[in-house]
């Protein structure tokens, strides 16, 4: 599914196209994109949603954004995706793979709480959307990675909620995006399925090296997945928490302490 068209988002200002440099990059280099957000503002009429926001995200980093409802989390994600325009300020991208003049729709993919599968297409055909003939085998490979190889010929209505989100994840990764945006994709799932999806997302993130940004109301989920947790409050970054816990993460005293620290910070906003 193409989420954007005709994007022309600038790279870092000191960055120049260097084909000889990009050619020397190893094929195994991370595909994630570095993101630099500077003095970002977003208004809807007279209502300020994001104000003077600065954020630097490293290539391949996993960021979680938390905060109360209405603090600007999903708005920030839509601005990064190019689904909305900034009021002013800049969002710049730099590829860890090679330099490029801008960023395309295939470079950024979004997963929502609603998987948005086409009901008249099979699971395999949903994942194949937007792929050319040479790329079609990628869809089958991804369905195998997410544990749905045996469901390829079924319809979305035949799948559970967790299986539909696994399909959406496979579809999002079919174009090898540099950035994966996760807008509360696990919010409607039961607890066990949610844990399974967290593990799957983490495994594919580690395998593929994309930059991941997760919006969530679940502080435990943020601690489970993120390298860094950003707390938004009234359109500003209120706090930032480094998550220096080994992966894969398990419940521990350190995990619980950080979870409580972040939760108390959210409740204090």
UniProtKB/Swiss-Prot annotation:
ATP binds at residues 67-74. PROSITE patterns: ABC_TRANSPORTER_2, SSUB. The keyword Cell cycle does not apply. Its EC number is 7.6.2.14. It comes from the Bacteria. It holds the Pfam family ABC_tran. It is a peripheral membrane protein. One of its GO terms (molecular function) is ATP binding. Keywords: ATP-binding, Cell inner membrane, Cell membrane, Membrane, Nucleotide-binding, Translocase, Transport. It is found in: Cell inner membrane. InterPro entries: AAA+_ATPase, ABC_transporter-like_ATP-bd, ABC_transporter_ATP-bind, P-loop_NTPase. It catalyses: ATP + H2O + aliphatic sulfonate-[sulfonate-binding protein]Side 1 = ADP + phosphate + aliphatic sulfonateSide 2 + [sulfonate-binding protein]Side 1. Residues 35-259 form the ABC transporter domain. The complex is composed of two ATP-binding proteins (SsuB), two transmembrane proteins (SsuC) and a solute-binding protein (SsuA). Belongs to the ABC transporter superfamily. Aliphatic sulfonates importer (TC 3.A.1.17.2) family. Part of the ABC transporter complex SsuABC involved in aliphatic sulfonates import. Responsible for energy coupling to the transport system. This is Aliphatic sulfonates import ATP-binding protein SsuB. The gene is ssuB.
